[in-house]
Every structure is written in structure tokens, then in C-alpha cells.
């Protein structure tokens, strides 16, 4: 079941709300691949004929999630970032971004605006807040030493 919590809309994965297309990619955690992930996800969403603003929203949210995996999940090592994008009949997209990196010790605290484990970087601490502002639902699960999974759900407007 997919729930767009901000707008109170629930979409169940049934015949009426089935996945109409899906893509999975794996990328090394190199900073150059942040733009690749952003472009692939936005291009895949184009089949729903979204507005330019909706595409920009997807790009920003994906960029933040992938950057978190690169910078915080893997830090100074190279690992794999797993991305799965599902498009549903009801003009809903679900993007799962997963790493097998360091994990987050306290997810609730990490989701607070301006919280960062990288105090030297003045632009840190807003990633989850940015994702939440551009998506209907953002889910985060993590285990220290096992990695983090971020699910972004966005409903596109009717055209």
C-alpha cells in the first residue's frame, strides 16, 4: 500500500492501482553519480507527463537522498547505491534509494532541520527537510552498520 500522508490520499497496490512501469539501477557512490540518479529518476517520471515544477521536485528530492548516501552512508569509501522507481496508475511515483553504508544512529533526530553529523560542512542538516518539502511522503529506515533506505512518494497532479 502507498500512502501519501500530506494529502491524506491512500493508494493501494490492487488492480485499480497497479504498477505500470518500474526501473532499478545500481550506482557507485561517486559524487558524479548524484546527477545521473537525479536525471534517470526524473526522465523515468516523464511518462506521467508531470509539470516542470513536479520534475524539479523529484530531481531535488532524489539529489538529497543520493547525496546523503554518498556523503554520510559511505563517507570516504565507495559502495553501491540501489535505486528503484515505480510508477503507479494513479499518477503516483515511489522512489526507493538504499545504501549498505554506515547507517543512521537516530533517524528521528537526523530528520530534524539543521541536525548534522558533519558540523564542518555549513550546508549540512537540511536533506530530509528538503525531501519532505518536495514529496508527499518520505520514509526512512536505517540500521547502524547495515545501511539506510529512503522511500520518496510523490503524487503528480491531473493533467
What kind of feature is each model-predicted range?
Residues 22-27, 48-51:
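A short, mixed-charge helix-start or loop-turn motif at secondary-structure junctions
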Residues 1-24, 69-159:
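Conserved beta-strand-loop-beta-strand hairpin that lines the nucleotide-binding pocket
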Residues 29-30, 54, 116:
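A generic structural signal for short
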